[in-house]
UniProtKB/Swiss-Prot annotation:
Shows antibacterial activity against representative Gram-negative and Gram-positive bacterial species, and hemolytic activity. Its main location: secreted. It holds the Pfam family Antimicrobial_2. It comes from Pelophylax ridibundus. One of its GO terms (biological process) is defense response to bacterium. This is Brevinin-2Eg. It is found in: Secreted. GO terms for cellular component: extracellular region.
Amino acid sequence: GIMDTLKNLAKTAGKGALQSLLNHASCKLSGQC
């Protein structure tokens, strides 16, 4: 249903945001930004 679709979208968006946050944090730590 539409709720499932929305849930999946939210999950995917959350994963993407978390991933980019982690990437940014690690590049800051290693001084590669």
